[in-house]
Amino acid sequence: MPVITLPDGSQRSFDHAVSVMDIAMDIGPGLAKACIAGRVNGELVDAVDPIVDDASVAIITAKDEAGLEIIRHSCAHLLGHAIKQLWPDTKMAIGPVIDNGFYYDVDLDRTLTQEDIELLEKRMHQLAETNYDVIKKKVSWQEARDAFAARGENYKTTILDENISHDDRPGLYHHQEYVDMCRGPHVPNMRFCHHFKLQKISGAYWRGDSNNKMLQRIYGTAWADKKQLAAYLLRLEEAAKRDHRKIGKQLDLYHMQEEAPGMVFWHNDGWTIFRELEVFVRTKLKEYEYQEVKGPFMMDRVLWEKTGHWENYKEAMFTTSSENREYCIKPMNCPGHVQIFNQGLKSYRDLPLRMAEFGSCHRNEPSGALHGLMRVRGFTQDDAHIFCTEEQVRDEVNSCIKMVYDMYSTFGFEKIVVKLSTRPEKRIGSDDLWDRSEADLAAALKENGIPFEYQPGEGAFYGPKIEFTLHDCLDRAWQCGTVQLDFSLPGRLSASYVGESNERQVPVMIHRAILGSMERFIGILTEEYAGFFPTWLAPVQVVVMNITDGQSEYVAELTRKLQNAGIRAKADLRNEKIGFKIREHTLRRVPYMLVCGDKEVEAGKVAVRTRRGKDLGSIDVNEVIAKLQDEIRSRNLHQLEE
């Protein structure tokens, strides 16, 4: 006779085992109709799973995040159902949920085309619209293996053989004649799976191993209703317009080529943005009292063996050799910073020591994972490491957090999700040390009034960390900033300082990154601003144009005056119509266009236009220069008169 406690604290008693669906029906038919699954004592279960003992139960509907994830997972099964009907010889591999959707890896003889995807999506809709029930059956390991062996599903039998205990009872989900295996839960009926779209196909090795067979991965998105799906597809359309690869080409910022995969060729305008970012970061380094250093980009393999990188990270490291010595091109800056710290005797009076570098790093990312500026092999980190005592950790973390928010606000990022990752099972250091460290990180966040969520067990083996994830104008998440405590590396590399008691002690090391990779951050900014960089970042800030040859000398003189005032200005003296010039520079996203006709020359003024098409009228030259200087100096996100 289970007693069920609902989220509002109310209780309902039953004289027999019940399911989540039974409980929903007992509350009301509307809730039963909306019920997708349930959370029983904190665990997600199918709507039909029996509850025999007292339990806390929450009904999951499409309005819940978990409900949406279940819909997406069931759509992956629906994809399997449809593809087996269209191409019965298809072998099904895995079909998990991902951000905003799902995918399924399949093995079939034909190469799928866009026409095939459209046909597949049509069949999925036909099946879903019959609103069939999804039937769950728990079976023995052997029954599950026999079922998939009989169907020739060798990937499923491999999963059973290698990943599932013989004592387990796998869940088989029956979609009419199609059967799939999953821990669940799934929707009870396909009426919940009407709002989806297949998006693209790519290649994927079985289990991510290039030694295995290449499968075809079919991606899709799924939502709770038509409105959500339409809004998401609109966001995708907007994201395509903002694609930094497309804008980078339009604005001539950079290029990449096959001879240097994952390496950036910065063109003049793109490099101007890069250097302006460096200037900005340097002003903050000075403000927050960091030293700027520069380490070598290549060091002996022996050093990387000491740090543990060679054992755990060598697949991602580029190596070379000379004179019978093997060298590693650095994937990160921290070991080099410890070497700098180790030069000369350090006292507790020298701490905290804050060391920053624009470090040129390289990582051997898989070629299939490379993506414009967002995923590269060669990149520059705005990296810093703080050497301090245990007692100084809290204040230093506090300062790091202030610096993170100070810098992000300059770029207009307002939604920042913060997560605190705590001790994993395998770790170094005492529980007491972890207790204090985690408490210091949490206290620093609370002191700054920053809401955060814990990620239990997600910290590195050498210390807890804070992650800062930016959300852009399309609400896409970009994990950029980290503040990571490290109890391991300084000791591994023999870093020490003389403490107050005159004994050598190992410093705590704080890894701190804010922008992360400079290249990736420029990619993020390009998409955030759609190429309309704020004036302080814009490669060309002002173009001065003449209407006829009669104003050429005035334009040239004004351009020099702007340049001498520290403004990135260019003159356009081409023999083209003024409308053509304005249109061209507007497409180049130049913040300001200054037009000079005879009236402007006579009055010592310029006609000012913005790239958004706003006419600011005729303004005195010195006033324009002063206003532009102020906008650039303050790193204002908005243009004049906006």
From Swiss-Prot:
Keyword Cytoplasm included in the entry's annotation: yes
Purpose: Catalyzes the attachment of threonine to tRNA(Thr) in a two-step reaction: L-threonine is first activated by ATP to form Thr-AMP and then transferred to the acceptor end of tRNA(Thr). Also edits incorrectly charged L-seryl-tRNA(Thr).
Binding-site list for Zn(2+): 334, 385, 511
Record-linked Gene3D superfamilies: 3.10.20.30, 3.30.54.20, Anticodon-binding domain, Bira Bifunctional Protein, Domain 2, Threonyl-trna Synthetase, Chain A, domain 2
Source species, domain of life: Bacteria
Pfam family membership, one: tRNA-synt_2b
Co-factor requirement: Zn(2+)
Catalysed reactions, as listed in the record: tRNA(Thr) + L-threonine + ATP = L-threonyl-tRNA(Thr) + AMP + diphosphate + H(+)
Keyword Transcription (UniProt): no
Subunit structure, interactors included: Homodimer.
Domain TGS per the UniProt entry, residue ranges: 1-61
Gene label: thrS
Subcellular location: Cytoplasm
SUPFAM superfamilies: Class II aaRS ABD-related (SSF52954), Class II aaRS and biotin synthetases (SSF55681), TGS-like (SSF81271), ThrRS/AlaRS common domain (SSF55186)
GO molecular function: ATP binding; metal ion binding; threonine-tRNA ligase activity; tRNA binding
Protein name: Threonine--tRNA ligase
GO CC annotations on file: cytosol
Region spans: Catalytic: 243-534
Keyword annotations: Aminoacyl-tRNA synthetase, ATP-binding, Cytoplasm, Ligase, Metal-binding, Nucleotide-binding, Protein biosynthesis, RNA-binding, tRNA-binding, Zinc
UniProt cofactor note: Binds 1 zinc ion per subunit.
Family designation: Belongs to the class-II aminoacyl-tRNA synthetase family.
